[in-house]
Structures are given as structure tokens and as C-alpha cells.
């Protein structure tokens, strides 16, 4: 009965404490951007009406939106504002002594704060501290030092022609990197207490698409994974770093006999010579003589990676009837990092279609 009631709108909120939230919603005329997202962040206490909420921050009407965030990690409680300039660019402000201070990183970089660390993932090449940090890398620095002017980042990941960073997730004591190596998932564990030493996460299914779906970063090193592949139904796994081996918790039922099919990866040359990978799924031992119906799928946009995933419909309605399924990882997606995405933007958009053809 004493909950927070917000009318239907494009809204955003973050808990500050049991009785207080940061709220972005339609507070009336002028409170939404031209994109119809929240233009203001306000502090609302339990029992207050929307008109009583205290203004914390506002952005230009031409910006996409704005969000307020409170981090609850014991000993590292902090408040942040994220100004979303558009789909790919944002600015992060940290409240220091009650005043918002913009973190001096590129607008197209992803930013996260974890305890004493500032983590930065630039999406374009960034020269900082006299060192060129490539697009798609992952950098770490002590937040206090950064605010004081230090720019001596530690490089946690550097992309190459075959490897891209898909995501990163903290547990209580470590950092798990989800990498794509030639469009197959590989997970690596970094330990900040030993200079970010790294080791592979053992037990991750091979040639699958694997994502971290949850961790407990303030309490334990427990982690949960979701794994899938062309012939592997969705599977949930659980482990605890250093104490409990990764094991399957539950899997979806299969919808076709996967033992009949082979999954292969091949590479094709696009018109400009760029090698473009694609997966092929077909009956084992199939003679590829051009006589078999083939379903070709691809996307190539918004830096979205098209990765191996299970489809009962494709398996039962197409593969079991003799069809061949092909998934193409064309440019415009994120399979090889930001550069793979930007290579098919604007005047270069035809490259995505050339890759697909």
C-alpha cells in the first residue's frame, strides 16, 4: 500500500535505500526528451507524490535519456548519473563531495565502477596517458588515482583479428571475461588481487554460445551460465570460482536428434577480400553438390553478434527434412568487436550485403 506508484510512461529507476529511489519518468511538460525518454533524474521518497520529487540532474531535450544510479557495495557506496547522448554514446558523472564530476573517457566507451576500480571499454581507438588503447580493449585503473589525474591504465584485454570481448562480469573476488574466439565463446577469469592474473574457466562447453547470466559480486564467487549451440538445447550451469566445479543445473528438452548432424565453420571472401566466417549445419556425411535446399541467415547491424543457438523449429522442420542451415557472421555485427561493426556503417553499408552474397 505504501509502494512507489508511477503512471504508465517510459521510466527508469534505481534504489538508493529502502525508502528512496532515483526516478526518471514523465513528470509533466518538459520532463521527457525528444526521443520520449526521461530527461530528468529526481529523488523520490516513499510516500511522496511525483510533484514532491527533488530534481537531481537534467539533460538537453535533444539527448536520448538520463539515468541515476546508486551503487550499494559496502565501503564503496556511490552515486552516478549517466547521460545517454544517443544509442552508442554516453557520459558518466560521479558525485564527489555532492557535486557531479564527469569521468574523462570517450563518449563511445562503456564504463563500469567496481569497488576501487574504474573499468573502461573504448569502442574506438583511444590515446590516453601517451599510449594508444585499441577499440574493443578493456582497461582498468584505480578510481581515486584517475580522479587525481593518473592515466596509467592496466590493459585487461586487447583484441586481435580472431578474438573480441563480448562481456565482463564481476564476482566477489574476480572478473570473468566472455570472449569470442572465431565466433565461439571462451571464458577467462582475472584475479585483481594477483595483478589481474588470468586463467581459463574450466568446464565451459566447447563450440557453444555461453553467457554469464548472474553473479553475486558483493557476497560470493558464485556464477551462473547459459550455454547453447546449433545442436545443444539451452542449458543452465552453476559454479563457484575456486571451490565448486561447473555443473549442469537444467537443460531444455531436445526437439530433434542432434546426433545426425554436423556443425562446421567455413570462411568466404567478400568483394573487398575480407574473410567472413559462416556456420553450416547439415546431415552428417552430406555431399555438398549444390542440390540441397539451403537456408541462409545473417544480420549485420547494431553490433549484434549472431552466434550459434538451438532452434527446434530449424532442426525439426528444416534439417530433418534434408535442408542445410547456414549462419553468416557478416560485418555490421559485433562478432569481431567494434571494428567489425563500424566497417559496415554509412557509406560502407554495402559491405554487409556483399558479405552476405
Each language-model region and where it sits:
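Beta-propeller folds
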Residues: 1-222, 226-234, 238-243, 258, ...
Amino acid at each position: 500500500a505504501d509502494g512507489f506508484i508511477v503512471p504508465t510512461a517510459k521510466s527508469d529507476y534505481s534504489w538508493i535505500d529502502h525508502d528512496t529511489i532515483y526516478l526518471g519518468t514523465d513528470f509533466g511538460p518538459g520532463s521527457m526528451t525528444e526521443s520520449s525518454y526521461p530527461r530528468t533524474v529526481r529523488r523520490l521518497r516513499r510516500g511522496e507524490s511525483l510533484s514532491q520529487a527533488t530534481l537531481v540532474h537534467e539533460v538537453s531535450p535533444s539527448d536520448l535519456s538520463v539515468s541515476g544510479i546508486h551503487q550499494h557495495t559496502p565501503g564503496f557506496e556511490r552515486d552516478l548519473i549517466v547521460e545517454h547522448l544517443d544509442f552508442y554514446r554516453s557520459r558518466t558523472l560521479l558525485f564527489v563531495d555532492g557535486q557531479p564530476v564527469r569521468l574523462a573517457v570517450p563518449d563511445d566507451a562503456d564504463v563500469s565502477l567496481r569497488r576501487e576500480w574504474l573499468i573502461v571499454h573504448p569502442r574506438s581507438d583511444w590515446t590516453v596517458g601517451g599510449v594508444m588503447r585499441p577499440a574493443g580493449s578493456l582497461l582498468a585503473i584505480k578510481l581515486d588515482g584517475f580522479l587525481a589525474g593518473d592515466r596509467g591504465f592496466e590493459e585487461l584485454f586487447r583484441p586481435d583479428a580472431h578474438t573480441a570481448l563480448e562481456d565482463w562480469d564481476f564476482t566477489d573476488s574476480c572478473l570473468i571475461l566472455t570472449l569470442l574466439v572465431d565466433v565461439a565463446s571462451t571464458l577467462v577469469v582475472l584475479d585483481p588481487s594477483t595483478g589481474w592474473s588470468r586463467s581459463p574457466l574450466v568446464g565451459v562447453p566447447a563450440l557453444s554460445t555461453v553467457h554469464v547470466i548472474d553473479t553475486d559480486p558483493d557476497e560470493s564467487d558464485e556464477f551462473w551460465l547459459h550455454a547453447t549451440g546449433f545442436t545443444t538445447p539451452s542449458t543452465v550451469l552453476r559454479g563457484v570460482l575456486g571451490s565448486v566445479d561447473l555443473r549442469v543445473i537444467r537443460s531444455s528438452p531436445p526437439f530433434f536428434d542432434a546426433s545426425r548432424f554436423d556443425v562446421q565453420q567455413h570462411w568466404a571472401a567478400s568483394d573487398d577480400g575480407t574473410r567472413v566466417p559462416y556456420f553450416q549445419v547439415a546431415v552428417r556425411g552430406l555431399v555438398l553438390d549444390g542440390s540441397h535446399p539451403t537456408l541462409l541467415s545473417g544480420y549485420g547491424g547494431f553490433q549484434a553478434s549472431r552466434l550459434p543457438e538451438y532452434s527446434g523449429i530449424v532442426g525439426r522442420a528444416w534439417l530433418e527434412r534434408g535442408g542445410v542451415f547456414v549462419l553468416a557472421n557478416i560485418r555490421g555485427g559485433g562478432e569481431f568487436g567494434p571494428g567489425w561493426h563500424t566497417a559496415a556503417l554509412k557509406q560502407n553499408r554495402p559491405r554487409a550485403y556483399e558479405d552476405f552474397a
